[in-house]
Curated annotation (Swiss-Prot):
Keyword RNA-binding among UniProt keywords: yes
Source taxonomy: Eukaryota, Metazoa, Chordata, Craniata, Vertebrata
Gene Ontology CC terms: cytoplasm
Gene name of this polypeptide: Khdc1b
Gene3D superfamilies in the cross-refs: K Homology domain, type 1
Protein's name in the database: KH homology domain-containing protein 1B
Pfam families referenced in this protein's UniProt entry, alphabetically: MOEP19 (PF16005)
Recorded superkingdom: Eukaryota
Similarity comment: Belongs to the KHDC1 family.
Length: 126
């Protein structure tokens, strides 16, 4: 991931094709990104992604979330968000730990590899 930061991942057009797009409840958005999106920039920098939040996108008041960037990083962010909002206690705890980690440390290649090995429903060969 440090190579991506040095080379500027945003200069790679492939990272902008097929963005991850999903809707999120307002309270979950505030929990993850903070009041007034206080943690949004930190999450973007630490995950090498660009995250766009469109509030009140749906009639139910949900926020439309669009994530672009390297595929493994996008999937990591989406899985963290999914786990934070999970009703399963173990997933919720894992999601909160992932959230605390990304708020304080940039993701490393090892973080992404461990994540893909330890319970993600996606697998990518090297």
């Amino acid at each position: 991931m440090s190579d991506l930061r040095r080379k500027g991942w945003w200069n790679v057009p492939d990272y902008f094709y097929s963005p991850l797009v999903f809707d999120m409840e307002e309270d979950q958005e505030d929990y993850i990104f903070g009041p007034d999106d206080e943690y949004l920039h930190t999450l973007e920098v630490h995950s090498n992604t660009l995250i766009q939040l469109e509030r009140w996108f749906s009639p139910t008041g949900q926020t439309r979330v669009t994530v672009v960037g390297p595929l493994k990083a996008r999937l990591w962010v989406m899985d963290m968000i999914r786990k934070v909002g999970s009703k399963n206690t173990l997933d919720k705890i894992k999601g909160k730990l992932m959230l605390l980690h990304i708020r304080s440390h940039p993701l490393t290649d090892q973080d992404l590899q461990i994540h893909l090995i330890s319970g993600s429903s996606c697998w990518f060969p090297d």
